[in-house]
Swiss-Prot record:
HAMAP family recorded: ArnA (MF_01166)
Chain residues that bind (6R)-10-formyltetrahydrofolate: H86, L87, I88, R114, V136, K137, R138, A139, D140
GO cellular component: membrane
GO BP term (any one): lipopolysaccharide biosynthetic process
Domain of life: Bacteria
Origin species: Escherichia coli O81 (strain ED1a)
Protein name: Bifunctional polymyxin resistance protein ArnA
Ranges in a coiled coil: none
E.C. code: 2.1.2.13, 1.1.1.305
NCBIfam families reported in the protein's UniProt record: PRK06988.1, PRK08125.1, PRK11908.1
Length: 660
């Protein structure tokens, strides 16, 4: 049976050997070039392929049409992936009539995603395994063909568990590959309600946070022990690595991070104490704990820290342009909740952020981004992270004021992007779900979905196209000039402080605010073209938590990424949104202050938005990038969001002259 193989690492080598032993004909192997910054303790797929006389390739993007065409010419009957690090597009998977199969290092549906070997140790699991599953468009989500369980011993570290998993994988493939070859397999669908997903780990993720329990820190040490980069901490600005450790149930009143003793080297934790058995100072040699203490100049009572002392003293400076807006004010609240951010903001108003004005780490200037260019350039240069959130983002304005939309949303933001390039500052740019336009995919995918808009004589697309072009400009600056960026695409975020009722009175607001105004004033709820258009509504708290994690950027996982932030489970039509809102309104304690419900009224989009409007029937996000990069899932049910949004707006209404 002819196959094309995607493989890397030891698992890739043993997968290839297993295929050859089972009588498969391997037409080509796709692998990766080795990362010079990664310790290569594993077998070389490229070398094995060369020794076996099999063509081998390592393209930067195997999903490029040219590579897709070359793979199609190979006419594979079946495709296998063994620890290949890039997602393979559905078009390639469909080339094999017998399907595509992937070997994953966990007991799916648990631990989907990257680095499951390390994550199970970090989380203190006592069992893991290997899974062979059918490949589908969503990573690690296809039906399970075979699994083999592997026990995790208390003394297992990453390398010993790796060897166990390789042994199990070899057994699994020996048992299963002949069955696939003869079409004699039983597939079991994964239970989505049991799925967990974890993102890529980097060396920077392995710092030891001493306020955590000793058992948690010991698991971290196990998870990244040599040949992985190791768990680390600091004495002042001196970094050191912990290669092995033991947990002590030591009852101590010492502050977490304090040295309890130096022989053995025992560190107080949030619960218990951690003995550093072996470690390494800087780029030095490995030594026992007591010698490490001497090398680092530690004595009883010394304090360790999770980051360099110089870094601990300086807060990250975040510049938010449009800080008074819906996202801006909620994000400010989230950042100021932590003690390591300094927020600088600019906006033309301050009503939503008045609650922060006396905060010592919040700095606000009232102004217009089209006028205060010198202030903006200075603060881009001064700050570490830039979020240009200023935009006209209400549909009626796209047809009412298309040139103003272009001038503000595109031209003013392009200038800010160029400042970030000039001063080499990280930009987190708000793209939009609107860029997908009339895409027909079931789930809108950041990396694969086409961006489809209407003709030029439909000005409603000027916002979508302005944002899309900025996305492309930012991407190009990242590729060609090293701009550090992340693009995030909100999908119908809603919650308190979304627009205001005055904006709704002139039609310049989002859907839920307009519907609330209709209820408050006793006017009919207008359903544009029947209100059958479906959207996925996302609670602002879920959205802001994802955005906060992008700013945190653990392990730089968000660099160069496009991330949808939405809740695919909260899909509803505008009509259904109106009905849910009405039900919440009718049982609200302030209901008696407002007029009777005036009913629903169907109106044509052209009469409401004006000439040149087109709508989109559905807009559902794929959130695999958010899961992978942020370890994020939306949690808040749509009804809860509706109730809280309605309550906020009803309590902003002056009730003094309303009937009781």
């Amino acid at each position: 049976m002819k196959t094309v193989v995607f493989a890397y690492h030891d698992m890739g080598c043993l997968g290839i050997e297993a295929l050859l032993s089972a009588g498969y004909e391997i037409s080509a192997i796709f692998t990766h070039t080795d990362n010079p910054g990664e310790k290569a303790f594993y077998g070389s797929v490229a070398r094995l392929a060369a020794e076996r006389g099999i063509p081998v390739y390592a393209p930067d993007n195997v999903n490029h049409p040219l590579w897709m065409e070359r793979i199609a010419q190979l006419s594979p009957e079946v495709i296998f992936s063994f620890y290949y690090r890039h997602l393979i597009c559905d078009e390639i998977l469909q080339l094999a009539p017998r399907g595509a199969f992937n070997l994953h290092g966990s007991l799916l549906p648990k631990y989907r995603g990257r680095a499951p070997l390390n994550w199970v140790l970090v989380n203190g699991e006592t069992e893991t395994g290997v899974t062979l599953h059918r490949m589908v468009k969503r990573a690690d989500a296809g039906a399970i063909v075979a699994q083999l369980r592997v026990a995790i011993a208390p003394d297992d570290i990453a390398i010993t568990l790796h060897h166990k998993l390789c042994h199990a994988a070899r057994q699994l493939l020996e048992q299963t590959l002949p069955a696939i070859k003869h079409g004699n397999i039983l597939e079991i669908a994964q239970r989505e309600n049991e799925a967990t997903c974890f993102g890529r780990r980097t060396p920077d993720d392995s710092f030891l946070e001493w306020h955590k329990p000793a058992s948690v820190l010991h698991n971290m040490v196990r998870a990244v022990a040599d040949p992985w980069p190791g768990a680390f901490s600091y004495v002042g600005n001196q970094k050191f690595t912990v290669w092995s450790s033991r947990v002590h149930p030591h009852a101590s009143k010492a502050q977490p991070g304090s040295v309890i003793s130096v022989a053995p080297l025992l560190i107080a934790c949030g619960d218990g104490a951690l003995e550093i058995v072996t470690g390494q100072a800087g780029d030095g040699i490995t030594m026992q704990g007591s010698q490490l203490a001497q090398t680092l100049g530690l004595v009883q009572g010394s304090r360790l820290n999770s980051q360099p002392a110089c870094a601990a003293r300086r807060r990250t400076r975040v510049l938010i342009l449009g800080v008074n807006g819906f996202i801006g004010n909620h994000l400010t609240e989230r950042l100021l909740r932590e003690d390591h951010y300094e927020v600088y903001g600019l906006d033309i108003g301050s009503d939503a952020i008045s609650r922060f004005m006396n905060h010592p780490h919040f700095h606000f200037v009232e102004g217009d981004i089209s006028i205060h260019s010198e202030w903006i350039e200075y603060h881009v240069k001064k700050c570490d992270v830039v979020l240009p959130l200023v935009a006209i983002a209400t549909p009626i304005e796209y047809t009412r004021n298309p040139l103003r939309v272009f001038e503000l949303d595109f031209e003013e933001n392009l200038r800010i992007i160029r400042y970030c390039v000039k001063y080499r500052k990280r930009i987190i740019f708000p793209s939009t779900s609107e860029v997908y336009g009339m895409c027909s995919d079931k789930y809108f995918d950041e990396d694969h979905s086409n961006l489809i808009v209407g003709p030029v004589n439909k000005p409603r697309w000027i916002y979508s196209v302005s944002k899309q072009l900025l996305d492309r400009v930012i991407w190009a600056y990242g590729e060609k000039e090293g701009l550090q960026f992340t693009l995030f695409r909100p999908f119908n975020w809603m919650g308190p402080r979304l627009d205001n009722l005055n904006a709704a009175r002139i039609g310049s607001s989002r859907a839920i605010t307009q519907l609330i105004l209709n209820l408050v004033e006793g006017s009919p709820i207008k359903l544009i073209d029947g209100g059958k258009q479906k959207r996925c509504f996302t609670d602002i708290r879920d959205g802001i938590e994802a955005l906060y994690r992008i700013i945190e950027n653990a392990g730089n996982r968000c660099d160069g990424e496009i991330i949808n932030i939405g809740n695919p489970e909260n899909e509803a039509s505008i009509e259904e949104l109106g009905e849910m809102l009405l039900a919440s309104f009718e049982k609200h304690p302030l209901r008696h202050y407002f007029p009777p419900f005036a009913g629903f009224r169907v109106v044509e989009s052209s009469s409401y938005y004006g000439k040149g409007y087109q709508d989109v029937e559905h807009r559902k996000p794929s959130i695999r990038n958010a899961r992978r990069c942020l370890n994020w899932e939306p949690k808040i049910d749509m009804q809860e969001t509706i109730d809280e949004t309605l309550d906020f707006f009803l309590r902003t209404v002056d009730l003094t002259d309303k009937p009781s």
